[in-house]
């Protein structure tokens, strides 16, 4: 399964978990069932979901540092989760080049976000990737 589809699925799972206030595991199972997908084909999506949820506090601190005028709670759920996914890949996945993580996030924003999502996501990620060491989580 292509990584783009895996990222789309991970985003859907993270969104569902946050909105429905359920565990990532339960949201993943629901998503697999809803779309008739085989969990074995979505191992990278599962890894992204698990990784983002395990490090969500660290990722959110980065987002908060960069988005001075936007509190996390004010951000659209989909935008917040796209940024979390991208930051997870930037800081915790050495096999994913930074430009790939950012470009994939922009595609997710174009597909799942609002008219302004792509610009918003690009602004946040752009600041981080300009100086990744400045924002690297502890």
Swiss-Prot record:
GO cellular component: cytosol
Cross-referenced Gene3D superfamilies: NusB-like
Xref: SUPFAM superfamilies: NusB-like
Keywords for this protein: RNA-binding, Transcription, Transcription antitermination, Transcription regulation
Keyword Transmembrane helix among record annotations: no
A molecular function GO annotation: RNA binding
Family listed: Belongs to the NusB family.
Role according to the record: Involved in transcription antitermination. Required for transcription of ribosomal RNA (rRNA) genes. Binds specifically to the boxA antiterminator sequence of the ribosomal RNA (rrn) operons.
Protein's name in the database: Transcription antitermination protein NusB
């Amino acid at each position: 399964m292509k990584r783009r589809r895996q990222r789309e699925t991970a985003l859907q799972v993270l969104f569902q978990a946050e909105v429905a206030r359920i565990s990532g595991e339960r949201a993943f199972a629901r998503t697999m069932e809803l779309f008739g997908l085989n969990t074995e084909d979505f191992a990278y999506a599962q890894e992204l979901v698990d990784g983002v949820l395990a490090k969500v506090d660290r990722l959110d601190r980065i987002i908060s540092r960069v988005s001075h005028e936007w509190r996390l709670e004010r951000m659209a759920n989909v935008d917040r989760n796209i940024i979390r996914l991208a930051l997870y890949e930037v800081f915790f996945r050495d096999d994913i080049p930074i430009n790939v993580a950012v470009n994939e996030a922009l595609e997710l924003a174009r597909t799942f976000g609002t008219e302004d999502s792509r610009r918003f996501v690009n602004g946040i990620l752009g600041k981080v990737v300009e100086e990744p060491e400045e924002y690297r989580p502890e």
